[in-house]
Amino acid sequence: MQLTELIETTVTGLGYELVDLERTGRGMLCVYIDQPAGISLEDCEKVTRQLQHVLTVENIDYERLEVSSPGLDRPLKKLADFERFAGSEVSVTLKKPLDGRKTYRGILHAPNGETIGLEFERKKGEAAMLDFTLADIDKARLIPQVDFRSRK
């Protein structure tokens, strides 16, 4: 069983979604998890304990394990991610330029089959639609929406 498959099976078995997995050259294993209600410190501890056990049993070599939430600027990797975050502001970088540019920022539209839509501003006030597939994407991330105004 490959490392990604092993970790995904463990994480989903605990009721979480594996968002991303990174392995650094220094032996650090970074696991990013999520669930609709968000991730707490207790969730990270629970997954860490289980993964440490599984990685030891499977004799997987690593120096350090880090489990965390994907953060406010969560990466979008699966079609289900694009479905879940439809209506959100995102940044998408394509593998190949389209209309002379690779990076687009706009409002995500729900996928239609394999096609994902992004409404962006081409020029001041001129809205345009970009259609692409997962295969076209180099990287895609949510753009954090933070409100610093005080609540009354």
From Swiss-Prot:
Which UniProt keywords are given for this protein, alphabetically ordered? Cytoplasm, Ribosome biogenesis
Task: Write down the Pfam families for this protein, in alphabetical order.
Answer: DUF150_C (PF17384), RimP_N (PF02576)
Q: Name one GO cellular component term.
A: cytosol
Q: Which CDD domains match?
A: YlxS_C (cd01734)
**Biological processes per GO annotation:** ribosomal small subunit assembly; translation
Q: Where in the cell is it found?
A: Cytoplasm
NCBIfam families named in the record: PRK00092.2-1 (NF000929)
Functional summary from the UniProt entry: Required for maturation of 30S ribosomal subunits.
| Record-stated family | Belongs to the RimP family.
Q: What is this protein called?
A: Ribosome maturation factor RimP
The organism named in the record is: Burkholderia multivorans (strain ATCC 17616 / 249)
Q: Gene name? A: rimP
